Amino acid sequence: LELHSPIKDKGDKTLLVALSDFHYGLEINEFNNTYNTTIFLERLEHLLCETIDKIKSEKISHIVVLGIGDFISGIIHNAIRIESRENVISQVINVSEALISFIDKLANFGYIDYYDCVGNHSRLFEDKNNCLAKESFDLLIHYILEQRFIHETNVNIHDFTISERIGE
């Protein structure tokens, strides 16, 4: 992706970008569907290019990025764990790096507010009754993003409060 200079004459519009269900690490090679980490990166790059085009054409100055969950394939189902081509730690690291790159590139074009929530695929155990709400790989992804952008003036990684009742 070739980044061009930021827009000089920005408007006061806000753009919402929703990110969800990456299931990073999962590999599918069926007659009607193919998905793997390479395809994930291609799709994220395509979304980034489309988003930047929209920012430029609409003179958008504020971008709200919503992470709606299931960024990783995770380990909650044995069948999914076996189909995953990366261990869960690599999934967390690589998704975090992809999100950092995505947000960092968008930040060249406007102010970023990032919000996220926990997905079910990031739980540590299959049975949700055996998990505490705060036992989630999504919290690691959030922490990595928070630490990466802590000193950035135009990126705000918002904290979230986890209700212990989520998933009931």
Describe each region flagged by the PLM.
Residues 1-168:
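Extended recognition/assembly regions associated with phosphoester-bond processing machinery
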